[in-house]
């Protein structure tokens, strides 16, 4: 008997798949199925999270092929990003070389897992062949008015003299040199995603195949709220402070105004006043805090009075203007109408700085003991201290006061969104160059489409200091204006890498198109992606940006599809010792070591069997050993079957014994269960468990009475087990399938169909209970009636002994399940 030599088997089949381009065949006469895992950043090494993510997608792809679908299952590389640039600074390795070496290494590791990718469609976002079309799409956005430039704040390291991304700011310091990070105003490029806020929100209802958690996160991120925009005139100036509030009914209780310290009016209002020095110091203090820190519920709310007042437009009362650490300039209008009686944060601030608190809503039932001295009242109620609106229900007063504000020309009812425009400028080298030219005469001029791609230059200096490395390349920086022909300068910012990943799934549909990013025909055929798989950490940015891009491209006429992903699976993390695997924790398990010791199929089987895909998976060495033992058990059974010609024993043409029928039932019940588990629920763990039970039954069947073994039935059991395991353990099953004399690949073989008649049992086990406690079990005909079941129960010897001399209250009979006799 041949041993399970996984090393040679896996190498053999990987080479054969590659030679035959086994997964590149496209057959348009079949229904399409597009399965996609989020493409990785090429760090150089895959980790167990990758193994799990890609194994899940591969099971789906292989299953759908066997079910007769025309499957698209591509892979590529999200290959722009900071690590490559940091490697250039630290080790003097050019990002392009560093990235290509990592891609090569990771591709070999993915192939070693036996993943069924169509490598003919491979994309890498850092290649000119790809980023040409990213630039082309930017130009389409620009011409549509969706790409624009404005001044905004960025993180600035004074030591490195460079801009830092948010993820490079660690505890207020630079991740390179630990210097305190400040803020700096720069002109930056944005995408106008807010133009699509309503469409992005409204179409969440189309995402039936997405987890509710992810849909809720997107809804909250977009953050639609109804309210009023109100203008508060600043005393003794011609300026007004514009605020948005969801509670116009509380405007009479507004006793102070809070501005973000970075609000454009602040420095102008305090200029050459006694408050200027304190305001500057306060602003400088906040320079070293992230937006997340400033808005945290844990942080103490701090502020200072700036010496100015504004006028409440409905009461004409003067209210003081403060700046505070918890108000952000780019959220809302950067100004808040503070109503301390009805907002706990405002109340805490008012108490700290001794600001007036004016309740304008009281509880409907005044006997409920509510005390404004203890907490803010945030519910609806009866209006008070609100002039002509006193006595009204606050919910009705909401509309009345909003109308009153409009009558006074002091504001309007409106809808606000939490969503902000997408800042895409990065002062980096290793990203897609923004295809814009600056001319002293013509201003901002887009690069002509025929001149794309604007390629990244090689002659740059990676010092880690100053502005973008692109500014160090004279050949890149200096160019001619496309409009007037005079000398001009190129944009030296590159795009946020989320831009690259917002449309890659469309490029896969037509990856080698040199005329367009993709043809409309290909996009409409393949998109939406039928099943998208990736981590929940991408629930907002990547998924929202991809939805935005798809909607814009629909409006541009590039595709007819409004949404990119039909179904979404967010897989859980791989843990060890209860924590996410990381080098710092010393709990990393290397996929390469597992593959070398047990084989790729064992690694795949374990990560698919150990937990449902959407849950976290706890690594277990014993679990890996168990998966390896199971594959060896299947191997021995199949080898024994082949070596001993067991299938020659008898024929299915002969009458089946009860033992035969039981095995046939198990075979076809397993087909039904595995099909349902994989197709409908992605319950891969229970699917594998069902195959394990079938293997147990085949062993029992073989060993009980070998002389009366039905060879054809046993062969059916062996072949079914191999087919059902094929998506999970692809090399293993290919080898056994070939050993069984099959000419066609197991992965191109039709998925087995279960026989409805075979899973109808002649007999069923009934549980016998007395007063709800199990006393016996018995086999009865499947079609026995309720009355017959009661009669059989009353004739059961154990039951007769228990109920003798007792009063029978009632008999509960449930056909095919149980009989419960209630006595006293």
Swiss-Prot record:
Aminoacyl-tRNA synthetase among keywords: yes
GO CC annotation terms, alphabetical: cytosol
Key word Metal-binding present: no
MF term (GO), any: leucine-tRNA ligase activity
Chain span(s) of sequence motif 'KMSKS' region: 580-584
PROSITE patterns noted in UniProt: AA_TRNA_LIGASE_I (PS00178)
Compartments reported by the entry: Cytoplasm
Name this polypeptide is given: Leucine--tRNA ligase
Taxonomic lineage: Bacteria, Bacillati, Bacillota, Clostridia, Peptostreptococcales
């Amino acid at each position: 008997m041949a041993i399970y030599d996984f090393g040679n088997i896996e190498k053999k089949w990987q080479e054969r798949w590659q030679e035959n381009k086994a997964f590149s065949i496209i057959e348009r006469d079949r229904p399409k199925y597009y399965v996609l895992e989020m493409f990785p950043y090429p760090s150089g090494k895959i980790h167990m999270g990758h193994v799990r993510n890609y194994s899940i997608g591969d099971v789906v792809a292989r299953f759908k092929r066997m079910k007769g679908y025309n499957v698209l299952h591509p892979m590529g590389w999200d290959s722009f990003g900071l690590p490559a640039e940091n490697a250039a600074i630290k080790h003097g390795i050019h990002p392009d070389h560093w990235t290509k070496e990592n891609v090569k290494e990771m591709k070999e590791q993915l192939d070693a897992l036996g993943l069924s990718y169509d490598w003919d469609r491979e994309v890498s976002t850092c290649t000119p062949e790809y980023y040409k079309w990213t630039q082309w799409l930017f130009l389409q956005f620009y011409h549509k008015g969706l790409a624009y430039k404005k001044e905004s704040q960025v993180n600035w390291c004074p030591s490195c003299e460079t801009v830092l991304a948010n993820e490079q700011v660690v505890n207020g310091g630079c991740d390179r040199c630990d210097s305190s990070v400040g803020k700096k105003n720069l002109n930056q490029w944005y995408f106008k995603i807010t133009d699509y806020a309503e469409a992005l929100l409204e179409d969440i209802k189309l995402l039936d195949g997405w987890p509710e958690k992810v849909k809720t996160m997107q809804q909250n991120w977009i953050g639609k709220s109804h309210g009023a925009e109100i203008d508060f005139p600043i005393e003794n100036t011609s300026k007004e402070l514009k605020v948005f509030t969801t509670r116009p009914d509380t405007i009479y209780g507004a006793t102070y105004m809070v501005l973000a310290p970075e609000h454009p009016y602040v420095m102008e209002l305090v200029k050459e006043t006694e408050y200027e020095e304190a305001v500057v110091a306060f602003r400088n203090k906040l320079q070293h805090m992230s937006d997340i820190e400033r808005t945290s519920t844990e942080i103490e709310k701090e502020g200072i009075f700036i010496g100015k007042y504004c006028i409440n437009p409905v009461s004409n009362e003067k209210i003081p203007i403060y700046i505070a650490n918890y108000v952000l300039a780019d959220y809302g209008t950067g100004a808040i109408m503070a109503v301390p009686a009805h907002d706990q944060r405002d109340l805490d601030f008012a108490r700290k700085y001794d600001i007036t608190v004016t309740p304008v809503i009281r509880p409907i039932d005044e006997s409920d003991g509510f005390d404004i001295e203890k907490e803010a009242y945030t519910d609806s109620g009866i209006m008070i201290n609100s002039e002509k609106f006193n006595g009204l229900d606050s919910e009705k007063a909401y509309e009345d006061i909003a109308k009153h504000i409009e009558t006074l020309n002091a504001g309007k009812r409106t809808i606000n969104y939490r969503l902000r425009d997408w800042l895409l400028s990065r002062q980096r080298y290793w990203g897609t160059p923004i295809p814009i030219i600056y001319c002293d005469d013509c201003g901002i001029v887009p690069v002509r489409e025929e001149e794309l791609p604007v390629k990244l230059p090689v002659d740059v200096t990676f010092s880690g200091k100053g502005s973008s490395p692109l500014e160090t390349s004279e050949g890149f920086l200096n160019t001619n204006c496309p409009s007037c022909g005079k000398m001009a300068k190129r944009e030296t910012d590159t795009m946020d890498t989320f831009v690259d990943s917002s449309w890659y799934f469309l490029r896969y549909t037509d990856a080698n198109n040199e005329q367009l990013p993709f043809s409309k025909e290909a996009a409409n055929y393949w998109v939406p992606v039928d099943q998208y798989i990736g981590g929940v950490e991408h629930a907002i940015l990547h998924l929202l940006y991809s939805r935005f891009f798809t909607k814009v491209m629909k409006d541009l006429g590039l595709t007819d599809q409004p949404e990119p992903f039909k179904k979404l699976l967010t897989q859980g993390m791989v843990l060890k010792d209860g924590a996410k695997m990381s080098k710092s924790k010393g709990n990393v398990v290397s996929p390469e070591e597992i593959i070398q010791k047990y084989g790729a199929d064992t690694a795949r089987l374990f990560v698919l069997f150990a937990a449902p895909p959407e849950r976290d998976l706890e690594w277990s060495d014993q679990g890996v050993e168990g998966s390896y033992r199971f594959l060896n058990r299947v191997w021995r059974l199949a080898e024994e079957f082949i070596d001993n010609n067991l299938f020659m024993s008898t024929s299915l043409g002969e009458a089946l014994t009860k033992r035969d029928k039981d095995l046939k039932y198990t075979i076809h019940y397993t087909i039904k269960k595995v099909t349902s588990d994989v197709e409908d629920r992605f319950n891969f763990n229970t699917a594998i468990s069902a195959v394990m039970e079938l293997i147990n039954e085949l062993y029992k069947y073989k060993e009980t009475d070998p002389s009366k073994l039905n060879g054809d039935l046993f062969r059916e059991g062996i072949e079914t087990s191999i087919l059902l395991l094929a998506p999970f353990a692809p090399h293993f099953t290919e080898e056994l399938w070939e050993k069984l004399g099959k000419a066609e690949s197991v992965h191109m073989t039709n998925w087995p169909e279960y026989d409805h008649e075979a899973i109808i049992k002649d007999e069923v086990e009934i549980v016998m209970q007395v007063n709800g406690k199990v006393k016996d079990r018995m086999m009865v005909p499947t079609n026995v009636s309720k009355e017959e079941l009661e009669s059989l129960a009353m004739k059961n010897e154990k039951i007769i002994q228990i109920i003798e001399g007792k009063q029978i209250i009632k008999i509960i009979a449930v056909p095919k399940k149980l009989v419960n006799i209630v006595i006293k």
